[in-house]
Amino acid sequence: MTTTTIQFNALLLDIEGTITSISFVKDELFPYAFENVGNYLEEHYDNPATQIIVEDLRHIADQQAENDVAVVRIREPRKECIEDVTKNVRHWIKRDKKLTPMKALQGLIWEEAYQRGDVKGHVYPDVLPVLKIVENRKIPIYIYSSGSVHAQKLLFANSIEGDMTKILYGYFDTNIGLKGESNSYTKISERIKIPPSEILFLTDVEAEAAAAKKAGLQTKLVVRPGNAGLTQEAINAYGTIESLEEIL
């Protein structure tokens, strides 16, 4: 835990394990997408957005089928295409692959889930009060997650705390780069026009904290129930917090 006041002019937040419980993502969102991917494709196959995703997934499948026997090449006919995409997406979900078009498809599936009221986005109780204080200090708040920007917005628009999107300035996903690569954080700094040293990044993942720190950002590791354990080396290098209140 940290007791010193942290000075920052932008707040960059991971989602899963940081402001949202890992169990919500792992035990609710991912299984929902896993179970409903085929049904969604059946209902929305001819939608232009769906077709773009399918084509992107076809290219990825062609590449990965060379080295992964569980990945099938996606056939052209509608019925076979849906079968193949469903099989691949379920395989990638099991492997926790960070594939941008798959994340986009998951986002579309979750959009329906939120609209139907099947799910509500979980946030820890300390999150919204702290973000309101940060916003009142005129400090912009950004989200950076491997989930698509679309999925991020859905979660915060349909959270158990209500619509939180009004206090969030922007969102980043794997289109800006992978979270374990320092260049991604450099790009975010350039995009929001705030020097890296003035950005505070909160995450529960050591590799992400390392990448952000390498890019010059301030970092803290967030400790939440159910999160993976942290090495003593990481705790010493980045420090930990157990509540967002500790950044105030």
From Swiss-Prot:
Organism: Caenorhabditis elegans
Localization: Cytoplasm; Nucleus
Recorded GO CC terms: cytoplasm; nucleus
Cofactor: Mg(2+)
SUPFAM superfamilies listed in its UniProt record: HAD-like
Residues that, per the record, bind Mg(2+): 14, 16, 204
Similarity remark: Belongs to the HAD-like hydrolase superfamily. MasA/MtnC family.
Keywords assigned: Amino-acid biosynthesis, Cytoplasm, Hydrolase, Magnesium, Metal-binding, Methionine biosynthesis, Nucleus
Pfam families from the UniProt entry: Hydrolase
Listed GO MF terms: acireductone synthase activity; magnesium ion binding
GO biological process: L-methionine salvage from methylthioadenosine
Catalytic activity as recorded in UniProt: 5-methylsulfanyl-2,3-dioxopentyl phosphate + H2O = 1,2-dihydroxy-5-(methylsulfanyl)pent-1-en-3-one + phosphate
Classification via InterPro entries: Enolase-ppase_E1, ENOPH1_eukaryotes, HAD-like_sf, HAD-SF_hydro_IA, HAD_sf
Residues at which substrate binds: 145-146, 179
Enzyme class: hydrolase
Protein name per Swiss-Prot or TrEMBL: Enolase-phosphatase E1
Assembly information from the UniProt record: Monomer.
Domain of life: Eukaryota
Stated role: Bifunctional enzyme that catalyzes the enolization of 2,3-diketo-5-methylthiopentyl-1-phosphate (DK-MTP-1-P) into the intermediate 2-hydroxy-3-keto-5-methylthiopentenyl-1-phosphate (HK-MTPenyl-1-P), which is then dephosphorylated to form the acireductone 1,2-dihydroxy-3-keto-5-methylthiopentene (DHK-MTPene).
Cofactor, free-text remark: Binds 1 Mg(2+) ion per subunit.
EC identifiers of the protein: 3.1.3.77
Pathway entry: Amino-acid biosynthesis; L-methionine biosynthesis via salvage pathway; L-methionine from S-methyl-5-thio-alpha-D-ribose 1-phosphate: step 3/6; Amino-acid biosynthesis; L-methionine biosynthesis via salvage pathway; L-methionine from S-methyl-5-thio-alpha-D-ribose 1-phosphate: step 4/6
Organism lineage string: Eukaryota, Metazoa, Ecdysozoa, Nematoda, Chromadorea
